[in-house]
Amino acid sequence: MVITNHLKIVGVVPASGASQRMGRDKAVLELEGRTFVQRAVDALRCGGCDNIVVVVPKVPTIIRAAALNTGARVLTNPDPSEGPITSMRVAIGHLGDSADAIAWLPVDFPLVRGEMVRRLCDLARRTLAPLTLPVHEYFIEGVRHEKRGHPAIFSRALFSELLDPALQGGARTVVHRHLENAAIEVFRDPRIATDVDTPSAYEAVQAGRTPYEDQPPQTKVERYP
């Protein structure tokens, strides 16, 4: 019998970035009738997260409005200029002792599905690993490749490191420190790793393609993160 611990996992959707590469606010872009922020919240909700928060900037207010429409708790990042780690800190600071882990799903991964999130949450609860990470596995001319994906699940044991003001390199640095002890879930579905942060990538997913599926990676194995 497999014993699964009920680790309280809170989904966190960072939506406070400047969207410079896209040229417009990614959170409010639509795909199949739902905004990117709605798709992220839906995936986390269907995937078994206990609660969900969306972190938005002070302006533009259109992002806040879209986030409020999802039914998730909406938090404000007063200064997102230092990158995604600032949104992560806002979320962790708000959650206090109410979360055992966070499932970090950036708003520009709109193809992630609830069943994908559930696989990751189940793995995190089963292993109690400090990190639970998804990778997309694929093959080009018989050579195996990996591409990083989301959501990444960070346990409470790592919160102090993520909150450390001296941290350089953001959450990526924390991932590298603890990668050997991470639980890795391998997916064959490219949607787990489809980052839609440029106009061409948005056009690709609207046409039903993943933005990178026809482009060989620069290295034979691209490892998380």
Spans of model-derived segments:
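Short beta-strand and adjoining strand-loop segment in the mid-core
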Residues: 89-91, 157-162
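Residues at alpha-helix boundaries and the short loops/turns that link adjacent helices
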Residues: 31-34, 165, 169
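Nucleotide phosphate-binding site architecture
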Residues: 19, 29, 159-160, 203
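A short local structural element in Rossmann-fold oxidoreductases
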Residues: 23, 64, 163-164, 206
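Short glycine- and hydrophobic/aromatic-rich loop-to-beta-strand nucleating segment
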Residues: 150-154, 194-196
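Conserved alpha/beta core of the MobA/IspD/sugar-nucleotide pyrophosphorylase nucleotidyltransferase superfamily
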Residues: 2-7, 160, 166-225
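Nucleotide and nucleotide-moiety/phosphate-recognizing core
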Residues: 2-148, 180-187, 212
